């Protein structure tokens, strides 16, 4: 249930973030600037509150936060070397990059909340997506059924107006079957 966040919004957020917050590791600002300057890469960037389970994640912290300064995780390998992360991103530009940022008041920052996405790899996100899909399917089926009921009623009225008893009986039978379903 990933929502598409425009590249323009992601870049605006990162610019604002880098102006307002001092990162624990300077190389992280360099890495974020590198991402920001490449629209193709920015299309693959996703900001998450929790990056657990994602295939490729950057965890970056600002000063004043009790979190590790930086970590890069790809599959089951974790490193705190920003340069390794840069080389992996540069060499694998078709892979999505999930970024978990830690900074003061992140849950009340409107620009951050505007680019924040659900982690598609967390079980509760998948369950929520499946529940949403089931509800959407049920709504669609009910809409189709109501449309069919309306069309059948209109056709029955037309058959009555035309005095067509055979069509009236046939359509009435269809209408009754549809109402029971």
Swiss-Prot record:
Coiled coil: none annotated. InterPro entries: IDEAL_dom, UPF0302, UPF0302_N, UPF0302_N_sf, Virus_scaffolding_prot_C. It holds the Pfam family UPF0302. It comes from Shouchella clausii (strain KSM-K16). This is UPF0302 protein ABC1905. Belongs to the UPF0302 family. The lineage of its organism: Bacteria, Bacillati, Bacillota, Bacilli, Bacillales.
